[in-house]
Amino acid sequence: MKNWDNVVLVPEFDEQGVACYRLEGGDYENEYYVISEAESRKLLNTPEIVGYEVYNCLVSSTSQMLYYLKEQKKVTTANILSILRGALNYPLEEACYREHIRVHDISFLSSERVFEEEEIAGLEIKYSKLTMVPDSTLMIGDIIASGETLIHCLRYVTDFYRDHGARLRNIIIFTIGGTKGIDILEKLTAEIRQFWPEFEGFITVYYEGIFSTYQDKGVSGINLPDVDFYWKGGIVAPEFRRETLSMCSPIFEKCIIYDGGARRYEIHEHVEEVLEVWKGISERADKIDFKELLDEKLGYPTPISYEDWVKANHYQDIRPADAKWLYRQELGYIESMKDITLKELAEQRIGEFTDALRKYILD
């Protein structure tokens, strides 16, 4: 990540229960924001939230951010690009309606992986229904992990506009996503400006944090590289950190979001995945170093000094009183986890999850 060590999280606004931060110090071409709100925190900390509620949990924060962007004159006429089916979890149309932002058109794209000899050979657009709104703001909601789908679809859309002699003013992305998104969008901006020099760039809004993806199977041996999100190497909203560490288990989940599509539409698959994860951890608990697992989830080896902790979390511009409280809370959390074994934690989660979502479990 270019200049990542120099990046700091800077408070932008705190209104209507939504806290917003922007990234500074990275010398980026684009704007990057992190927003935090009670419902989106609940979504990412509670895999028991499924179905329509997954969508509903993002409405308030999305609306408030669009209000801010409208006030900043960053968005006028919107053209929503719905990348199927991940986009269906993001309430962009509803949020625009609430904030009196005119949605001119909604375009649809679907891309699928192409396999050759059981290996991914690339991506192919399977369905396309594009509408062109010259000089508009393109809006996208998508999970960005590896970012391959996003790159593929954005190139397809910009080519479509160019073929019709039109251009886009800017692109706004709402995402539950990772650090790779920043690298990708910085490169894409340079690419787009070669043919649209006036392109204003991307405004990317991350819910609750800019996470990172595992690059291996992790300490537990169950994680999927370039798929599963965790805190390490990312930037987490202070409010999300506070809430996550006020509860016993959320930080130990396999992924911060799991499979967004399954969580919304194939709920039984999501239930099976979460139960399989915790059953696997329960079976292998005695082979997993609990301290090492906790350090991995927090993002650094502990103990860590307050000064190093602030730097590791990019919190230099967070109010010192708030940062110190968060640091003390984390120390308390680490201490409290010494009183529970990983097996006990796994059994507790299996029980909680089964009780909450029993109606979705297929025998």
Regions found by a protein language model. Name each.
Residues 1-363:
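PRPP-associated nucleotide enzymes
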